[in-house]
């Protein structure tokens, strides 16, 4: 742990140097706003490394995310807002405060206690147990979080069968929808129910959809290779022929 502290101090010093007049022009120009796309990108690259179970890649991407934390803290320090020490101190205090069953005299963990503590931190009256909608969080993840919050207070299906039935009901309503407004609403209800099912199956919907999309892209590229190998042009083939090549590409997945 002592070495980690030394290395972290070195990282902070490196960032200070990069932001100094003698440092890097690009780093000096960055602001909280200009760094937002990089923060999002690094987080998704870390998620990709986790999905691929690639430890070397995960190690590197965790470092890139940490860099973003140090970068923003340095910019804030220059503005006189807060320092990296403030960031760490605030985090430490929050972790201890939110785990009284570990660091205090509380007998055990409870969801209600967790929510009460969070409400006290925000200095306001208790908010709804269902949580708030964050427009910046991906829709699938937000739906999953809201459903988990509802489940914590007992508002949930007893088993997956109820969710399967709900999906069939929503699909039927989608087929019967007429105008664009109805279609959007019913499609949203169907997606919400599918995300609900993901909870019961212990499947992360974002990860599952990301993997399915990646699989589709890889198969499509394989199909393109097979078509080109046969001296044909993809755009000129009828759908029936494309389906044949698609099946061949799928077969290649299993080899």
UniProtKB/Swiss-Prot annotation:
Impact upon substituting residue 176 to A: Has little effects on the NTPase activity
Variant or mutagenesis effect after changing residue 173 to A: Has little effects on the NTPase activity
Top-rank taxon, per record: Bacteria
GO molecular function: ATP binding; inorganic diphosphate phosphatase activity; metal ion binding; nucleoside triphosphate diphosphatase activity
Binding site for ATP 1: 162-166, 169, 182-185, 189
Phenotype for residue 61 to Q: Reduces the NTPase activity to 10% of the wild-type activity
GO biological process: one example: dATP catabolic process
Alphabetized InterPro entries for the sequence: MazG-like_dom, NTP-PPase_MazG-like_C, NTP-PPase_MazG-like_N, NTP_PyrPHydrolase_MazG
Residues the entry annotates as binding Mg(2+): 169, 186, 189
EC class: hydrolase
Gene3D superfamilies: MazG-like
Keywords in alphabetical order: ATP-binding, Hydrolase, Magnesium, Metal-binding, Nucleotide-binding
Residues the entry annotates as binding ATP 2: 215-219, 246
Reaction equation(s) it catalyzes: diphosphate + H2O = 2 phosphate + H(+); a ribonucleoside 5'-triphosphate + H2O = a ribonucleoside 5'-phosphate + diphosphate + H(+); a 2'-deoxyribonucleoside 5'-triphosphate + H2O = a 2'-deoxyribonucleoside 5'-phosphate + diphosphate + H(+)
Temperature-activity note from the record: Optimum temperature is about 80 degrees Celsius. MazG is very stable at high temperature, and no change is detected up to 85 degrees Celsius.
Cofactor(s) needed by this chain: Mg(2+)
Record entry for activity regulation: Inhibited by AMPCPP (alpha,beta-methyleneadenosine triphosphate).
Entry EC number(s): 3.6.1.1, 3.6.1.9
Family, per entry: Belongs to the nucleoside triphosphate pyrophosphohydrolase family.
Binding partners and assembly: Homodimer.
Role of this protein: Catalyzes the hydrolysis of all eight canonical ribonucleoside triphosphates (NTP) and deoxyribonucleoside triphosphates (dNTP) to their corresponding nucleoside monophosphates ((d)NMP) and PPi and subsequently hydrolyzes the resultant PPi to Pi. The NTPase activity with deoxyribonucleoside triphosphates as substrate is higher than corresponding ribonucleoside triphosphates. dGTP is the best substrate among the deoxyribonucleoside triphosphates, and GTP is the best among the ribonucleoside triphosphates.
Name under which the protein is recorded: Nucleoside triphosphate pyrophosphohydrolase/pyrophosphatase MazG
GN (gene name): mazG
């Amino acid at each position: 742990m002592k070495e980690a502290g030394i290395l972290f101090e070195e990282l902070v010093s490196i960032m200070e140097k990069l932001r100094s007049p003698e440092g890097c022009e690009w780093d000096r120009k960055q602001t909280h706003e200009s760094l937002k796309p990089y923060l999002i990108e690094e987080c998704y690259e870390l998620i990709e490394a986790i999905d691929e179970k690639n430890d070397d890649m995960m190690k590197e991407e965790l470092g890139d995310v940490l860099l973003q934390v140090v970068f923003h803290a340095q910019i804030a320090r220059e503005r006189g807002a807060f320092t990296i020490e403030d960031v760490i101190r605030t985090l430490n205090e929050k972790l201890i405060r939110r785990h009284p069953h570990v660091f205090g005299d509380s007998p055990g963990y409870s969801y209600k206690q967790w929510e009460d503590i969070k409400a006290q931190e925000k200095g306001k009256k208790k908010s709804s147990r269902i949580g708030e909608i964050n427009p910046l969080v991906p829709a699938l993840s937000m739906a999953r979080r809201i459903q988990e919050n509802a489940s914590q207070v007992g508002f949930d299906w007893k088993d997956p069968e109820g969710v399967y039935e709900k999906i069939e009901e929503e699909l039927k309503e989608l087929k019967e929808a007429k105008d664009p407004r109805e279609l959007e609403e019913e499609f949203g209800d169907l997606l919400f129910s599918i995300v609900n099912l993901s909870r019961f199956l212990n499947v992360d919907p974002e990860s599952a959809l990301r993997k399915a999309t990646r699989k589709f892209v890889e198969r499509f590229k394989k199909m393109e290779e097979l078509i080109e190998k046969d001296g044909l042009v993809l755009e000129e083939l009828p759908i029936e022929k494309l389906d044949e090549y698609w099946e061949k590409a799928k077969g290649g997945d299993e080899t």
